[in-house]
Regions:
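Short, charged recognition helix plus adjacent turn
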Residues: 1, 66-69
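A short, Lys/Arg-rich alpha-helix, primarily the initiator
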Residues: 1-17
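Residue-level signal for the short linker/turn that defines the boundary of a DNA-recognition helix
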Residues: 9, 20, 46-49
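Alpha-helical residues within the helix-turn-helix
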Residues: 16, 27, 56
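Short alpha-helical DNA-recognition segment
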Residues: 19-38
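Short, conserved catalytic or interaction motifs in soluble domains
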Residues: 41
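DNA major-groove recognition helix of helix-turn-helix/homeodomain DNA-binding modules
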Residues: 49-64
């Protein structure tokens, strides 16, 4: 059996590239700062809808923000 794939992200890099704080990004996409922090640290995987909203907010393609390891 293959090892389980883990969804990872480059959210922090994309956010800092846009000079956004966690709070500012959270407000922009309609979630809490804690949610953004949890996604960035890998403690929480966003729903497909939230992942796409983050992509739009950061002007990134899905595969630029999220990847499997």
């Amino acid at each position: 059996m293959k090892d389980a794939l883990i969804l990872k992200n480059r959210l922090k890099e994309a956010r800092t590239e846009k000079k956004l704080s966690q709070s500012a990004l959270a407000q922009l996409v309609g979630v809490s700062r804690n949610t953004i922090s949890s996604i960035e640290t890998g403690q929480f995987n966003p729903t497909a809808k939230l992942a796409l909203i983050l992509c739009i907010a950061l002007n990134k393609k899905f595969e630029e923000l999220f990847y499997f390891d």
